[in-house]
Each structure stands twice: as C-alpha cells, then as structure tokens.
C-alpha cells in the first residue's frame, strides 16, 4: 500500500539484523533511497532501538548524496555521468536537503535542474547535500 510504511519497517528490521553480523563495522551497511519519507522511517526505527541493541551504524544515502560522495572521494566519474545518475527516475528539478555556501540552517528543499546540481557539487563550497 502507498499509505502504509510496512516496506520501510521491513527494511529497518533487515538492516538492524544485518548490523549485528560479525565483522560489520560502522558505515559498512548503506541504504540508498530517494524517498525522504522512507529514509525518515528507517532512521527513526534505528534510533528507537535501545542503545545496547543498535549494532553497527547505518548510512542513509540519496542518489545526489552518493554522487557528491563519489566526487569528494575522487572516484573517476565525468560530469555527464553524474548528471545521468542524478536524473535517473526523475523528471524536472532535483530536490535535495542541504546547505549552500552562506546558509546558517539546513534548507529542506533546495531545488534545481540536475545539470545545475552537478555544477554545485563540483564547485568548491557549492553545496553540502545532507539527503
């Protein structure tokens, strides 16, 4: 169902179980989703877990955040490839949560075309994508 959150809860349970496997260190498990609602539900399910039962820390990435992370880690990727990855599955502007050079607070709806977003990602101090 579109209105329920069963899928997100199941993902959270699976991620929680995986985070307890031997050899799993913080940041080894990454959930990639562009659904801000799903990410929020997964995050809150993990945070609701008692501290002693949490397991390894999980990373939640959106597609634009993955592209920014790849660029920052100097993974060989062209500008056209970045635009192609970011624009997959969407039409129109890309909406991200983040900060730009002179922001004091997190802006939850930075909206721009994928080409402009890639330009900001490549620009020093252009944008810090949170999700």
Where are these regions (language model features)?
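Active-site-proximal, substrate-binding regions of enzyme catalytic domains
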Residues: 1-29, 36-131
């Amino acid at each position: 169902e579109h209105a329920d959150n069963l899928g997100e809860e199941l993902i959270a349970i699976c991620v929680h179980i995986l985070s307890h496997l031997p050899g799993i260190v913080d940041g080894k498990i990454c959930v990639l989703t562009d659904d801000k609602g799903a990410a929020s539900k997964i995050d809150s399910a993990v945070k609701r877990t008692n501290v002693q039962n949490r397991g390894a820390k999980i990373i939640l990435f959106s597609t634009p955040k993955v592209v920014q992370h790849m660029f920052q880690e100097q993974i060989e990727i062209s500008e056209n490839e970045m635009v192609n990855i970011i624009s997959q599955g969407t039409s129109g502007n890309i909406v991200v949560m983040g900060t730009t050079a002179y922001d004091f607070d997190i802006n939850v709806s930075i909206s721009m075309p994928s080409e402009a977003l890639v330009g900001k990602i490549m620009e020093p101090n252009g944008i810090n994508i949170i999700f």
